[in-house]
């Protein structure tokens, strides 16, 4: 993957049509509790893919499995054409959690730098990349601030920059904007779409917010109640930007709500 600030998508047209994550009969239990059952679908390289469903439908568990944090009990999945057990590119999978998880004893710059601590990049290369992503999310003037000195929206930008600094091929997001007010959440939606256009990375995000899924995603997987199964995958064939005042978007939102 090239520079995060590249003006051209990093994937060729052919690669953008291929599957970057493929799931086959994926299931997960916690003791006697079935959380996920027979998950079968594929996520295309370069797309924004949303997962919606009721609480307890296994959405976050699913993200934890494809991030490598949790192992499935049965079934399998492939990343970039390789079985998960043989995949060696986990450092290019970024995970943005619901909580920003900023370290209070680190400045904005040092929180972003945390993502590069276990890499072989030289000091100057690290500094250049950190400065680049801080500029990219519009926080240059706040680079030396402490987390308690910045707003919730800014904290989300720091968390996003920390994810981007590793130049991920896939960005996983678990309700990252759910704690923000409506205006700030809308701003972060625009920020995510802008960065997606710049980098061409694949984005997979979980949300309870049907409007958020409709505004951001190319496709939406609807998970059933526990055990989580894929009820349907819905294509969102709407041009961007998608405004909530648009009648076509409103109809898409109504359609998704009916499917949950």
State where each predicted segment sits:
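A short, proline-enriched helix->beta-strand linker immediately N-terminal to the Walker B motif
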Residues: 165-169
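Helix-to-loop junction immediately C-terminal to a conserved catalytic motif
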Residues: 67
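Conserved ABC ATPase "signature" region
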Residues: 124-142, 194
